[in-house]
Every structure is written in structure tokens, then in C-alpha cells.
Amino acid sequence: MKLRGLYAITDSRLLADGRLLPYVEAALRGGARLLQYRDKSDEDARRLREAEALRDLCLRYGAQLIVNDDLELAARLGVGLHLGQQDGSLSAARALLGPKAIIGATCHGQLELAEQAAADGASYLAFGRFFDSSTKPGAPPASLELLERARARFPQPLVAIGGVTLDNAPELIRRGAAMIAVINALFAAANAAEVEQRARAFGQLFADT
């Protein structure tokens, strides 16, 4: 699948109390192309149930599920994987998941990290944070100019993350982001209908470019 558009990322705090599945389905209905399941807890049984349900939703809507930092779970479900800099070997993940799996890598604001990730077989390169982020307030910043340099340097699609909103996303897309990763500006919503509306608005930004 073409890696372009809205990349929705779950948040266990925002999507507690039964909101996970209806809010995610709303995002998919609104056009999210990739969905990252991000849950850092050690509740393995619950995480497996949720990931299975999310995989089925993604299949229904023609989207792709990406698991954050859990190679074993990604392999078990036959889905993609996102790895941070401390989350294990990308080349080992590629060897296990195979050549067609979507495997993304966090590169922060460093082209050197992206060089290594690209060499190890990353499907996409994620840069950020570009703006103040409530999810990861202490994450190192990345510059908008970095996106332009990365776009000229790498064939892999670029993901922009960190404080992305409908107001600042257009600049990220203009600078070279093929995907915009969104958490709060998508899921911090009053209801599922609002999530769908926000997802459609983010998707329209790509239609306008």
C-alpha cells in the first residue's frame, strides 16, 4: 500500500473506558491509512485482544495496523511494527517479519539515525517532535528544514510526529512529510463522530497538495 496520509496513533489514556475500538473505527472510517497501536503496559492478554480487534478493523477498512515496540506481537498477528531507538534491532525485525512488512523507525531529528534505519530496511522514517507535544513533552525537537533535507536524501516515505494539528500539518506536508502522525488532535474528542470528522479533515490536507 502507498504510505501517504493520516497515521493515527492510539493513546491508552485518551482511549480508556471503552473508547478504543469505536474511536479507532471512526478514524479509519474518516480515512486513516495507518494505525499504530501504542500501549506500553505489561498486560499481555489485554494487549493481544485489543491488537487482534484493531487488526480486524484495519482489514475491514483497507488500512494497515502497526504495533509499537513489540516484535513478537507483530509477528504473531502478521502486522507491521514501529521501533524506537531503544526498541531492538530493525534488521532483525525485518528478517523475522519478511520483506513485505511495514516497519517504521523513530529518527528524532537526526539524519544519521535515518541513514542507519534506511540501511537496515525501514519502510518509513519518522521524524519529530516538530511542535510541543503533550504525549512526549521531553522529546528532542526537530526542525522543519530537516524534512526538506530528508526528502532530498531518502526514498522512504517520511512521517512527521509531535504536536501535529490541522493548523500546522500543511507546512509539514509542504516540507516533505508523506504521512502525519496524530494522537491528541485526533483522539482527544468528545465522541466518535468528532474523531471521524477530524480524520477527514486531516485527509483532505493531502488531497489539497
Swiss-Prot record:
Signal peptide from the UniProt entry: none
Gene Ontology CC annotation, any one: cytoplasm
Database matches in CDD domains: TMP_TenI
Top EC class for this record: transferase
Protein residues bound to 2-[(2R,5Z)-2-carboxy-4-methylthiazol-5(2H)-ylidene]ethyl phosphate: S133, S134, T135, G163
Pfam families xrefs: TMP-TENI
Pathway membership, UniProt: Cofactor biosynthesis; thiamine diphosphate biosynthesis; thiamine phosphate from 4-amino-2-methyl-5-diphosphomethylpyrimidine and 4-methyl-5-(2-phosphoethyl)-thiazole: step 1/1
SUPFAM superfamilies listed in its UniProt record: Thiamin phosphate synthase (SSF51391)
Residues that coordinate or bind Mg(2+): D69, D87
Binding-site positions, 4-amino-2-methyl-5-(diphosphooxymethyl)pyrimidine: Q36, Y37, R38, D39, K40, N68, T106, K136
EC number assigned by the record: 2.5.1.3
Superkingdom classification of source: Bacteria
Function, as annotated: Condenses 4-methyl-5-(beta-hydroxyethyl)thiazole monophosphate (THZ-P) and 2-methyl-4-amino-5-hydroxymethyl pyrimidine pyrophosphate (HMP-PP) to form thiamine monophosphate (TMP).
Similarity remark: Belongs to the thiamine-phosphate synthase family.
Protein name: Thiamine-phosphate synthase
Species: Azotobacter vinelandii (strain DJ / ATCC BAA-1303)
Gene this protein is translated from: thiE
